């Protein structure tokens, strides 16, 4: 007979204290709350930006004021009061010293506790890291080594001053300010983020990584990332993020733009672990992100891989514009929701080039009373003959109160292309757990094994450093007390 007491704990097995929920006590420089033209001008002046960036911001702000927040997602959350949002908050810099000179021991200790290597360490894998704390970057590692090969990797704020021509040419070219409500907001008030340029015929010798940490309780984080891979180049980019544990909501609205030229490859991997709120649905980060890549040249390739385990609300659709002949777009995703979390995420694969290909593999895991939605668009234009798409969207339900939805949208405008879509939903039930228990495997181990197998197709696509972290993170999320 099945142990009802133990099996009833399946729904709660995801509940594990959030290990990154600590906050760092530091002195902070803050702008007044709210989003308005005065704040935008103050921010641009503070960052000593050229006029074209201020114009870009102000234009975006005017667009944003006329827009309405999207309500088509399968999401339910309190209305965001932008008058209560801090657009800019940064640790106070000591007078006469730059950011690198004034990284306090507290901030260094924070990143070390998070496992982010911003100090040289021969024991750790060699990864170039840009560490962003609230509204500013505290420097990028391995810059000198990368510059020797012509690779630019720095904060977006530094790039605006040092490489204005590249910024002017590419900023907003893939995600224009008016693309959507949150992209317009980001374009108006973006603070920091990363910039990367890989020159022709260069394979980046190390993985590039940016780590985002929200520390201030009232601050929003509005980072901007821009990556350009010139002809015959290759780069792996890794992104991670965490936030303290508060009983109020924080806002994260980011934009990522990728440009990939002939025979170039960009692999963009994310482990998203913002605070998700407590088991009553209190607190957590509102995560509204726009990510898009352009495969401009022949044989160009962009691959998005993501593990989404955090945030109270997630609204995110990494996408590919496949313009080049024989270009390739890929999307590999695991989204794990628990308690009252809600995620509406997916991808767009837009085919314009002949013989272009796209692959979508999405895995959704839902526990508690969470809602997990996949929303996808595949569009093959009339000019994209002999193109091919395959999509696989699978869902795994844990317990009886969770919800899973899949909304595929397929448009094929020529008769010489092929689209495949398949999906299935399954539930971890008492019988499966009982089967494992009969072989001496406890509930937590059983759940870990089931979920690990379910996610294997995606986790195998992550770089080794992230794959290890991803498996560890899934196991942490799946741990809980067994009655």
UniProtKB/Swiss-Prot annotation:
What keywords were assigned to this record? Chloroplast, Plastid
Q: Write down the Pfam families for this protein, in alphabetical order.
A: SUFBD_core, SufBD_N
Q: Name one GO cellular component term.
A: chloroplast
Q: Which SUPFAM superfamilies does this entry report, sorted A to Z? A: Stabilizer of iron transporter SufD
Q: Give any single GO term for biological process.
A: iron-sulfur cluster assembly
This one is known as Iron-sulfur cluster assembly SufBD family protein ycf24
Q: Which PANTHER family match?
A: FES CLUSTER ASSEMBLY PROTEIN SUF (PTHR30508), UPF0051 PROTEIN ABCI8, CHLOROPLASTIC-RELATED (PTHR30508:SF1)
Give the main localization category: plastid
**Source gene?**
ycf24
Q: Where in the cell is it found?
A: Plastid, Chloroplast
What the entry lists under InterPro entries is as follows: Fe-S_cluster_assembly_SufBD (IPR055346), SUF_FeS_clus_asmbl_SufB (IPR010231), SUF_FeS_clus_asmbl_SufBD_core (IPR000825), SUF_FeS_clus_asmbl_SufBD_sf (IPR037284), SufBD_N (IPR045595)
Plastid among the record's keywords?
yes
Family membership, please give it.
Belongs to the iron-sulfur cluster assembly SufBD family.
